[in-house]
């Protein structure tokens, strides 16, 4: 491991310290290493043909006209990407789904876009991780 020196604006350093404290890092170096790993992983997943894993989470209104069946249809259309799906009833109207996906990151992004773009889907978020050799 090597030691490096960086220069940060006071506001950015304060933000880093606040983030480090909230997330329970023992020091700034650990926080910066995790931030860099996250940025590198995100960049790697944007390369065409990259294999990886992803978690797609979203909330949707299960009573919205045909929405549940449209989502299921989209999932079946991309069955080769799906590893597992967790379905949670949040309240009378809303459901949370969490899908674990595996495959080409371009295909995963396309699947996520198809789901998140559905009318009645809210809070859609895709977290991608490149497959490490």
Curated annotation (Swiss-Prot):
- Pfam hit, one: RHH_1
Q: Which UniProt keywords apply?
A: DNA-binding, Metal-binding, Nickel, Repressor, Transcription, Transcription regulation
Query: Domain of life, per the record?
Result: Bacteria
- Cofactor comment: Binds 1 nickel ion per subunit.
What molecular function terms (GO) are annotated for this protein?
Answer: DNA binding; DNA-binding transcription factor activity; nickel cation binding; sequence-specific DNA binding
The cofactor(s) it depends on are: Ni(2+)
Its GO biological process terms?
regulation of DNA-templated transcription; response to nickel cation
Q: Which CDD domains match?
A: RHH_NikR_HicB-like
Chain sites annotated for binding Ni(2+)? 76, 87, 89, 95
User: Does the UniProt entry include the keyword Methyltransferase?
Assistant: no
Q: Which family does it belong to?
A: Belongs to the transcriptional regulatory CopG/NikR family.
Describe the subunit structure: Homotetramer.
Q: Which PANTHER family match?
A: NICKEL-RESPONSIVE REGULATOR (PTHR34719:SF2)
According to its UniProt entry, the function of this protein is described as: Transcriptional repressor of the nikABCDE operon. Is active in the presence of excessive concentrations of intracellular nickel.
Q: What is this protein called?
A: Nickel-responsive regulator
Q: What is the lineage of its organism?
A: Bacteria, Pseudomonadati, Pseudomonadota, Gammaproteobacteria, Enterobacterales
